Amino acid sequence: MADLALSPQRRTALTNLVRDESSFAAEYPRVADYWSTAGRLPGTGDDIADATFDLHLLHYMTGGASANPYWDIVATAVSPGPAERANRAEVNGGNPKGSARLAYAQIVLQAAYAYAIPSPATLRWVGDVAQGRPIFEVGAGRGYWAHQLTRIGVPTSAFDSHPPDRATNSAFPAAAGQTATWHPTATPPSTPADLVAAHADHALFLCWPPGWENPMASTTLAAYQEAGGSSLIYIGEARGGRTADSAFFDLLEQEWTLLDQDPGYVSWWNLGDRAQCWQRR
């Protein structure tokens, strides 16, 4: 587990923050709730690993400097998964079964940042498979991935039907002490065709598009290919999982070819998402 080098002043500030429960709850309610709850939940079985993870979460979610705070929090808990998950890199805290404590942290972090984990290696992979094209992301949520990609030099435009900085978004609820959007996120035009018309020469990025037969993924992909778009970067689960809809996977099977899949993609232990690049046939 990576050690977190904190100055004496920062350690004192964090100690004072957690001791002043009323101020903690007012300034960082989501973090305060996690902090008060985590100790009562079963951990991974490694108390030092759990405490290290919690300290990283506390530090980075209460103003600790970081270019990629989501990654800097979860990187402490990345370990190889079991053989049945192909020994993939995953956030499991050193326990293939994860823990209830880690599952609660997952809820907090996904709501604050993004559902998928943007490791530095996967960000570079996305930039590589984009092959110099700018990216447009539909369903960007808080724009965390768009922010990270732009930060490493991959021009990215972000769109979401409910940008969390100005609309209620149940997946990314507002909370004090939390960044509403990390990247300028526009509301898309009324139809997918209008949106993709200006971006057909971009790579389409769908990162955890809504599942349960919500048609967003399929209608966006259909409009994109109709406009002449040819490059899709998809981060999500396979057919029947928590992301995208059946019509989306039908389109992939009928009209698209899988070019690459990031072998180093880091997932949560309890999810089956992966990062893929598809090309129109």
Regions found by a protein language model. Name each.
Residues 159-203:
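S-adenosyl-L-methionine
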Residues 132-141:
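Conserved class I S-adenosyl-L-methionine
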Residues 1-118:
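N-terminal accessory regions of S-adenosyl-L-methionine
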